[in-house]
A protein has these predicted regions:
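Active-site microenvironments that recognize anionic phosphate/pyrophosphate groups
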Residues: 37-161, 165, 173-237, 246-315
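Conserved, mostly hydrophobic/aromatic
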Residues: 169
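Low-acidity, Ser/Thr- and Arg-rich intrinsically disordered low-complexity segments
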Residues: 2-4, 14
């Protein structure tokens, strides 16, 4: 029998289309229960992911880690040794993750550059635009496959980000059964209006996902696929704004104390959004109670004014 927290037993004789969880994940769960000969399948009733992602620690054995084992060879620098490459565009390589530690997922890695010490903050405009356009295209390709309930794209950078390798890369992960967007809505991206140019705008969240300082770069979905001059211009502007935001997060926000950051990409309500945030030790309010925190108005105003100056100068 399939089990999940706060679940209700649902007999199979009812039509599955009438169940509250009318989606691909429920169909897969129902089929799995039938194969096991179960008379009932347990249906999750609360909003959010159907269950926690399952991490298989055995599959993480031998995984390189620049934070715990510095000085070890970088697998992304050994291009000739890379396997299961999905797409390539010059130095940019999208491939399956060798260490697929999460069950019922497809974990992939997008290597941004051949330069081990590069980062979004250091790319010249041509390389920056190429990286962002390639990443958005690979993300869309995985979504368009229809093989996953949701597809997540994100970037870890630094020892507190959750990442293990320094070499610049992103991750694109297809979730077979979970809705990675279940707890996310537009409220997490609205707040202080910092900057707008063309169809690209930047905000600071006042209802952040985690806190304390989350900056959002927002543009209409699908721009990266457009060939019209205005689409190319705004896609490049999206990348330029992101670079300026990350530079601010690392070099100026909170006195430039941050050594780590995350980027999280979303498609929501017809928009493509990337959320950038510095990473610190996670607050116990969030760990224990899922309570996010937001900086006070004076701090938000200061950040918005200074960030606006940088965006006007560089994006």
């Amino acid at each position: 029998v399939c089990l999940s927290m706060k679940a209700t037993a649902v007999p199979f004789r009812r039509r599955w289309e009438s169940f509250p969880c009318n989606d691909f994940a429920w169909a897969r769960r129902r089929l799995a229960c039938l194969r096991k000969g179960a008379r009932y399948c347990y249906l999750h009733e609360t909003k959010g992911a159907d269950m926690a992602l399952v991490f298989d620690v055995v599959k993480a054995k031998g995984k390189p880690d620049d934070n715990r084992r510095p000085g070890t060879s970088c697998p992304f620098c050994d291009v000739d040794g890379l396997e299961n490459i999905i797409r390539r565009d010059g130095d940019r390589i999208w491939l399956q993750n060798k260490f697929r530690t999460l069950r019922q997922t497809m974990q992939t890695v997008l290597i941004e550059s051949a330069d081990h010490d590069a980062d979004i903050t250091t790319y010249d405009p041509e390389e920056l635009h190429g990286v962002i356009r390639f990443a958005l295209s690979c993300w869309e390709q995985m979504i368009d496959s229809g093989d996953y309930r949701s597809v997540l794209m994100y970037k870890n950078m630094g020892p507190l980000s959750g990442g293990s390798l320094t070499h610049p890369h992103m991750q694109i992960v297809g979730l077979e059964e979970e809705d990675g967007y279940a707890e996310i809505s537009m409220k997490h991206f609205e707040g202080v209006d910092v900057w707008k140019r063309g169809r690209v705008r930047v905000t600071i969240s006042i209802d952040p996902v985690v806190g304390f300082f989350e900056v959002n770069v927002i543009c209409p979905q699908g721009l990266a696929h457009g060939d019209a001059p205005e689409d190319i211009e705004d896609t490049n502007r999206f990348a330029d704004a992101l670079q300026a935001v990350v530079r601010y997060v690392l070099n100026e926000h909170h006195g430039g104390r941050a050594s780590s950051y995350n980027l999280f990409f979303y498609h929501i309500e017809g928009m493509t959004i990337v959320k950038a945030l510095p990473r610190w030790v996670v607050s116990p309010y969030f760990v224990g109670y899922r309570l996010a925190q937001c900086n006070a108005e004076t701090t938000l105003t200061h950040d918005a004014e200074r960030l606006r100056e940088l965006l006007d100068a560089h994006a």
